[in-house]
Amino acid sequence: MSEKHPGPLVVEGKLSDAERMKLESNYLRGTIAEDLNDGLTGGFKGDNFLLIRFHGMYQQDDRDIRAERAAQKLEPRHAMLLRCRLPGGVITTTQWQAIDKFAADNTIYGSIRLTNRQTFQFHGILKKNVKPVHQMLHSVGLDALATANDMNRNVLCTSNPYESQLHAEAYEWAKKISEHLLPRTRAYAEIWLDQEKVATTDEEPILGQTYLPRKFKTTVVIPPQNDIDLHANDMNFVAIAENGKLVGFNLLVGGGLSIEHGNKKTYARTASEFGYLPLEHTLAVAEAVVTTQRDWGNRTDRKNAKTKYTLERVGLETFKAEVERRAGIKFEPIRPYEFTGRGDRIGWVKGIDNNWHLTLFIENGRILDYPGRPLKTGLLEIAKIHQGEFRITANQNLIIASVPESQKAKIEKLARDHGLMNAVSAQRENSMACVSFPTCPLAMAEAERFLPSFTDKVEAILEKHGIPDEHIVMRVTGCPNGCGRAMLAELGLVGKAPGRYNVHLGGNRMGTRIPRMYRENITESEILDSVDELVGRWAKEREAGEGFGDFTVRAGIIRPVLDPARDFWE
């Protein structure tokens, strides 16, 4: 809808079945506790299959062996993914040692998976180990509450290892926002931590009895780094500093990347600027955005339920005015800010507090002991001696943060001895994939297992055209839900079918433009043929400092997406 002719504030019609499930769940309890004791199946049944997502878990199975098990008349090998709540990605070394042990002892795959939402996931948790994982997390001060489904997910915060004071302030706000928007139900504590049930009725003053219409994602961003890809998120607080001290935030609302193949009512969208707010209004504004989306978001069609669609339906000014009314403020004009990068600075960086920070490249975020590269063991050994913390980045890498000069050599030796500091190309540093096969039930094509060898081939193309040190921001996502953030890449691959992808071009290096579909449903060899041709032109015709995405737009290879609600599919 246009701003002159906005649509209805509330979408009338038959509610989706997810709304029925939430209403009947007794504040997210369902019959999960009873289901845990059912040894006849390795999975959760009925509504519980979806309700466990509010508790930070997804039920999955190993798709590599699904057909084999079906032929043997066996149910799929059900196992859970658990995603930790870890605002800003900061984790202590004590916590790291605990999660390392659990991954080794109690998961099928034995790995820790860093995600591009600054947390970690366990894959392959059998039903018998589901309660123990929650209790292990609780024992070290962690939880998995609200890391999935219709809530405010893990809050991101720029991993700035240099501006230590600014990072500390922004990180505290990320934690405060996360805590403020958490569900108040006691279901999590009752089911997983055996806390006693009390007679009083639960209340959800912010989220409501049926929670949000859809997932909701929040970031705290410290320019000039856009490492957290703010335009993938519903609500973004862009830090504004004076003399190195945080004074307030610019608010941007309504970003989101997920689409559905062929559904032209869906589109990726960048976030819209609302205005500037002083620090003291941060929580009130966060709550106002969330409750406006709670009340106005589409509960009849989950494909059109995210904040980006609400904003387009009611109009930006209407949504903004309602946030101002609920928060009791008037936004000031946006303060100046700019982004100059979004990758991680791999290697050592000295902070202004004179501590050192070592950013380690972790390909696809998968921490495991590989032949000749025992990454998992190396990080465990570092965790045993490091006095600071670890920080997970939104690029699926890991920072060994706050290393004193006296410990630097020792930690570097451990990192080098375990293959954690092997040289990597600029192209590999700027490539990312979601998990996809074999564990993700939504996967249509390979992503994490596909990317390393595909990157090799792209590197060879860059070398062939005389630009081996250049890079393309490249993302692969196994389905159009977009976890790999391909819709903010210069070259984005979106899984369509096994071995086939839609190719999107025309994003930029800063992550501020949505790429457009260039070719549909093509194979790896066809993709590489296109990349070879395009990189050849880029190498010869580019202007000084011009990135691949900007070149494809300027050269007329692809039209830029200017207004996604209207021109994303053109």
From Swiss-Prot:
PROSITE patterns the record matches: NIR_SIR
Pfam families: NIR_SIR, NIR_SIR_ferr
Pathway stated in the Swiss-Prot or TrEMBL entry: Sulfur metabolism; hydrogen sulfide biosynthesis; hydrogen sulfide from sulfite (NADPH route): step 1/1
Binding site for siroheme: 483
Gene3D superfamilies named among the record's database cross-references: Sulfite Reductase Hemoprotein, domain 1
EC number annotated for this UniProt entry: 1.8.1.2
GO molecular function, one term: metal ion binding
Binding site for [4Fe-4S] cluster: 434, 440, 479, 483
Keyword hit for Metal-binding: yes
Keywords linked to the UniProt accession: 4Fe-4S, Amino-acid biosynthesis, Cysteine biosynthesis, Heme, Iron, Iron-sulfur, Metal-binding, NADP, Oxidoreductase
Catalysed reactions, semicolon-separated: hydrogen sulfide + 3 NADP(+) + 3 H2O = sulfite + 3 NADPH + 4 H(+)
GO biological process: cysteine biosynthetic process; hydrogen sulfide biosynthetic process; sulfate assimilation
Cofactor-binding details, from the entry: Binds 1 siroheme per subunit. Binds 1 [4Fe-4S] cluster per subunit.
Gene Ontology annotations for the cellular component aspect, listed alphabetically: sulfite reductase complex (NADPH)
Top-rank EC class of the record's enzyme: oxidoreductase
Co-factor(s): siroheme; [4Fe-4S] cluster
Quaternary state and interactors: Alpha(8)-beta(8). The alpha component is a flavoprotein, the beta component is a hemoprotein.
Function: Component of the sulfite reductase complex that catalyzes the 6-electron reduction of sulfite to sulfide. This is one of several activities required for the biosynthesis of L-cysteine from sulfate.
Family indicated by similarity: Belongs to the nitrite and sulfite reductase 4Fe-4S domain family.
Listed name of the protein: Sulfite reductase [NADPH] hemoprotein beta-component
Source organism of this protein record: Salmonella paratyphi B (strain ATCC BAA-1250 / SPB7)
Source species taxonomy: Bacteria, Pseudomonadati, Pseudomonadota, Gammaproteobacteria, Enterobacterales
Designated gene of the protein: cysI
